[in-house]
Amino acid sequence: MMFISGDISMDVEMPGGLVGGIKRKLLAGESLFLTRYLANGAGAVGITGPFPGSIRQHELDGEIICEKHAYLAHHGDVEIESAFAQRLGMGVRGGGEGFFLQRLKGKGTVWLHGGGDFLDFDLVAGQRLIIDTGCMVMVEPTVTYEVKMQGGIAKSLFGGEGLFLVHMTGPGHVTLQTLPFSRTARRVLAAAGGGRDETGGGILGSILGE
């Protein structure tokens, strides 16, 4: 939340009860609790993302699967759950971060956040899309996905890319982010002299300490 103006009250709730809250905390790294804003009269609530990027308003009527940090807020009858990966390999990201997801279902308005800009694909049945593990923001449940090792260890050592990529198959809509936070953080840390930019040297950079 960035600001509140007018006659707005705040409350705290735990969607899904204690079990649902613990799942969100352990599997997706989210808070046990969510803040509810209630309009008692005229007013406004301003929301912002946790890092530089873009915010999109999505009209939900059914179900979508989101990257764990994509969800910002919602209005209406929307349930938030932790979503398990469709394949065992989905629990591992090339950058060392778990590929954990959230499921949003119901009917209402949802606000999603992504680093950089959004890039959208409408996949037809059987159409494939291969993406970096950090670039996913949202997919429809009709899209199947799994993580696969790409091109062997040698390519990762010298190519500057991670070991794993997400293979998606339509039909369905996919939304990507052009600048994932993990990538931005590595670049900032490297520029500040406090770490290394692994995006430029892959695993080899880690081995050599670059």
Sequence positions of predicted segments:
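Composition-driven recognition of glycine/serine/threonine/acidic- and proline-rich low-complexity segments
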Residues: 1-210
